[in-house]
């Protein structure tokens, strides 16, 4: 077999959560380019409609569902509907996520729980819903969208870092528990990616200068740029395809080298 054939996703059904725009949308487009049928969800109908229109502009016929991925009953109903209307899910990308940039001592317990619920509990809930059919089918791929904050800490993101660190370990445990069923569970850890979530960190200042955080990230990233959502597409195709059949429980950091870099000597 030609090695490139192992990257084909023809005949596969891929569910990407929270994929109306941003990183999830870019990953779903890449999976479609490799041949997969795309299913996505979002929390509001208007977001699903915008997503469907965006996919259509790319020439992709996607299937969109309204679902709150923190609601186990709603997730189970969505997965059952997908299996009936589209097919058994071969590839799951747990992408849906939120971040609240609040100093820890200013954050309420409820705000902390909200982040944990979306960024950690939801991947558990959705994975739990799709794994039984993957076992029955004899294969499956789960990709959890982790973060550099799975490894690092910094001010104002305590809940996010706790959730993404937990997601890293959930990834390893799913791989350990279900690897014997030919299910591979890996993660992608994005660096700083130019998305609507990070737009406030890249705003040009009134004097025309870069935002201080923007300057900080460029100085800390050997690639000397922010990533773009499309940077995550090819890594996702690799982890979703037969090319990664002996890769399990790993986090692939797509961060421009920031985790490897201690910084310039003063």
Feature locations, PLM:
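Conserved glycine-rich cofactor-binding loop
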Residues: 13, 20-22
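Short C-terminal tail/terminal secondary-structure segment
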Residues: 2-5, 152, 237, 248-266
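Active-site loop immediately N-terminal to the catalytic Tyr-X3-Lys motif
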Residues: 102-105, 152-158, 180-181, 224, ...
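Substrate-binding pocket helix/loop in short-chain dehydrogenase/reductase
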Residues: 103-104, 111-116, 213, 217
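Alpha-helical segment proximal to the catalytic Tyr-Lys
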Residues: 132, 176-180, 245
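Active-site helix of classical SDR
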Residues: 127, 163, 171
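Residue(s) in the substrate-gating loop at a strand-loop-helix junction
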Residues: 147
């Amino acid at each position: 077999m030609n090695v490139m054939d192992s990257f084909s996703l023809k005949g596969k059904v891929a569910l990407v959560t929270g994929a109306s725009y941003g990183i999830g949308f870019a990953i779903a487009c890449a999976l479609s380019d490799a041949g997969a049928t795309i299913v996505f969800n979002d929390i509001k109908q208007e977001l699903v409609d915008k997503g469907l229109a965006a996919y259509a502009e790319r020439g992709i016929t996607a299937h969109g569902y309204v679902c709150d991925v923190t609601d186990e009953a709603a997730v189970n109903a969505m997965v059952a509907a997908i299996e009936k209307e589209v097919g058994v899910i071969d590839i799951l990308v747990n992408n849906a996520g939120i971040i609240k940039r609040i100093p820890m001592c200013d954050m309420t317990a409820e705000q902390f729980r909200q982040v944990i619920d979306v960024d950690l509990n939801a991947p558990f809930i959705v994975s739990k819903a799709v794994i039984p059919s993957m076992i029955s089918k004899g294969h499956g791929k789960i990709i959890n969208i982790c973060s550099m904050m799975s490894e690092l800490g910094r001010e104002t993101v305590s809940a996010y870092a706790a959730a993404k660190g937990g997601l890293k370990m959930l990834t390893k445990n799913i791989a350990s528990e279900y690897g014997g069923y030919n299910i591979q569970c890996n993660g992608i850890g994005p660096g700083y990616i130019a998305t609507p979530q990070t737009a406030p960190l890249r705003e040009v200042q009134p004097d025309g200068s870069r935002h201080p955080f923007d300057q900080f990230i460029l100085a800390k990233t050997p690639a000397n740029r922010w990533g773009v959502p499309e940077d995550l597409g090819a890594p996702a195709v690799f982890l979703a395809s037969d090319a990664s059949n002996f890769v399990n429980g790993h986090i692939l950091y797509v961060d421009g080298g920031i985790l490897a870099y201690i910084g310039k000597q003063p």
